[in-house]
Amino acid sequence: MTRLLRALGLALATVMAGPALHSAAAKTLVFCSQGSPETLSPDAAVSSLAMDAVRPVFDTLVTFAPGTTDVVPSLATGWTISPDGLDYTFTLREDVAFQTSAIFAPTRSMNAEDVVFSFERQLPGPGAAKTLGGVYAQFRGPRLASLVESVTKLDERSVRFRLKRPAARFLADLAMPVNAIQSLEYGYRMQQQGTPERFDTQPIGTGPFRLVDDRRDVAIRYQAFEDHWRGRPKLDTLVYSITPTASARLHKLKSGECHVAAAVDPADAAAIATDPQLRLRAIPGLTLGYLAINTRRKPFDDVRVRRAINMAIDRETIVSAIYPGAGSLVETPLPLASWASDDQARAYPYDAKEARRLLLQAGVTAGLKADLWFPPDSRSYNPDAKRMARMIASDLEPLGIKLELKSAPWESYWSQLMKGDSTLALAGWIGDNGDPDEFMETLLSCAAAKDGGTNIARWCDARYDALVGEASRITERETRADLYARAQALFHEAAPWVPMASARLLDGARANVENFVMSPLGSHDFSAVDLGD
């Protein structure tokens, strides 16, 4: 088997036309990921695919301790917070090297100027660095753009963030890959050469691996960064083999074509767990699958129609079929694993008769047509979106609602939804930082309902925003939970979604994979992973 896996690594290297492995004994780990990321630029990343793809290349000021959502130092060795909660001052690690590539060789180590650059280029307003970027959906939605007032260099090793208001989630936000620290020198070099797009397509970071090659829909190849500040990774080469279907990922895992397979189909969990060559990795996840209803499109701008859609869908049957033994119904816009999920809340019950009555009351007669978008491949929050879409269409058809099922390659799927171009859409979210605000504000706030935002239902309620906004500014958990419960009640009243399921995260691994720790956030970190015999 060892010979087979080494041969695979060499074969992939040949296919991708990258540099040859430096020895026959080089350690190559192949990760069967779920699809091609929409970008390799951290600040443009929206999906978990993109965040996983940029994670090997970049570091953040702070990070999450393995297997948890606890914030620990990374590029920053420490920080202080002012008594009013508005000023965060970070002390930066010394002698952190940036990677080199065929088009760039850094002349200095990371310093405060790089931190300021990494955030200022995303803030609203003029500035030379703005030409290097595009749409920063994560930053410019309800996240940091509305929170950060300024980022200031105090000296080479100190940076101060000044916030417009206190924010309980600020440190956790900084741990997300979208807030990675990038090279000012590299950005300006590409700008001067007239190739600013390379800053995004050929990324340079301080992370444990450097990008070697990206073949869309085939594979992404990384090589160990010898000068990483934590020390050289144990792996020589890391390959993301793009494998959209769960069945194909399982086949590759069993045959030894990959060492780790993402998002195992729940139906295959038992087979993996009983195979002596494999290991099933499972963890409760901060995951949420839902059906978003575009509240700006007629007749779905009528709350009675949205409630009817909720009541016409047999959620229990669908979730049992799609997540056998690995998913549970959710009643709110929060995963079950979230401490702020209101355990007293209940979603609309399945009641086709009442759904029909509501539609008639709203003046909707038979013959209503609408589009239903679904992701092109499996996700941990929805293992079989196409099947779910068909089951939803089957539930709505007796009410005279005819759905046209649509999909798109993953790199354009989310951008399509964020444009507001869908009527109904199956979507999902994996928590990026463990804070309830990650779901309640990111997916449902008025700020995120703007064009290009992550509130694809385009629902906006000032009362909801006020509750969630207040909860985001305080740190006392009991008070926050009460505010979030009241916001969840408003969500239920307006019915902009059909909440579907919260899933356990399931990955498969070869038995010789060492030090691989799953995250409740669904991310994959190979910086400490090794391969045994």
Stretch-by-stretch model annotation:
Residues 28-33, 215-218, 224, 312-341, ...:
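Detector for C-terminal structural segments
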Residues 91, 114, 123-187:
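Surface-exposed binding/hinge segments that line
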Residues 78-128, 160, 252, 299-301:
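Aromatic- and charge-enriched surface segment that lines or borders ligand/interaction sites
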Residues 194-200, 225-271, 389, 402:
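Ligand-site clamp/hinge motif
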Residues 35-52, 75, 102-106, 168-180, ...:
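A structural "hinge/loop" feature
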Residues 223-226, 285-308, 312, 503:
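A bilobed periplasmic-binding-protein/Venus flytrap-type ligand-binding module shared by bacterial periplasmic
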Residues 294, 328-362, 379-387:
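Structural transition elements
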Residues 32-84, 120, 127, 202-208:
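N-terminal lobe/hinge region of extracytoplasmic solute-binding protein
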